[in-house]
């Protein structure tokens, strides 16, 4: 509920903002909440968090430590469990929030119902951030999201590609805010390169191709494994390292065994220190079929890693083909292998791309993106009652 306004149209206290998300695992959208909590203007925003899935808690403690209060689990059995909707309604009603900022189209469907069930004068403004291209979502999710989206909502997209993929009624009012990274802070991890390579058992003359991505179908791991088989056959001294966990872990390990990759491909599981692991890489690879604006890719650029990535979503907004890395078509393991072999055998080209990568990362400023989101909060909070 927007309180009494001061002369400039803003409340006389920090805005009470509730971030609503499916879970607090280690995915990109979840990492953005941590980033916003870290760099927020505490005089403007007092954030709270509500998340659906009790099994997804990796980042809950970090958000609490950064001042998000409360961090509430809605204890849903799944995203489609309707019982979380009245629970969210109670959280919003009791917290008297000014803004509800939703970070998933599926979650947005129920969150809108929770907000609209409140008395009109008690309804917070709604902001929805679209983190992935529209086609990556299930048809039923797309239908229900479009059906429930309100004209008074504010929509943010993490990349131009995401915005362009949205249905017309949403696309025409969506704003692009590309998030960023703290490149200087990330680069401090490079001092641990030798130590981390030692832990992974990597020889000095071995080239490491690494990735950081959840083990889900959209991340293209089966393609990467097929490509890895060809790269190892053609180059010999190349190792693959993958950090991440997810529902496909057993299937991917079985595929790795069938391909005979042995110790040439290592699944590390979830690593809280994933950026430190990345410091051991020589090439960063992302084989995704869908992406919005991958945070791991931005972290790789900050570390000065040349990139081989699929040209999907907002990837091309970060990588110019032939400059910071090489772009290939999705679901084409032969193209992926060719690009990886080319870079693995050409250290001078990798070094040149590393310089471009660092320069590109310097333009991706995390505090700037947080300020842009908070400017949106200020704008919608200063507007007197609109249609909700």
Give the location of each predicted region.
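N-terminal strand-loop element at the rim of the active site
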Residues: 3, 9-15, 19-83, 247
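A conserved mid-protein helix/loop that constitutes part of the nucleotide-sugar donor-binding site
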Residues: 27-35, 207, 211-230, 240, ...
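A short helix/loop element that forms part of the nucleotide-sugar donor recognition site in Leloir-type
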Residues: 3, 187-202, 257, 386
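Short hydrophobic beta-strand element within catalytic cores of glycosyltransferases
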Residues: 306-309, 319
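Aromatic "clamp/platform" in nucleotide-sugar-dependent glycosyltransferases that forms part
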Residues: 270, 289
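Short His-centered aromatic/hydrophobic patch
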Residues: 102-108, 130
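Carbohydrate-associated surface elements
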Residues: 161, 180
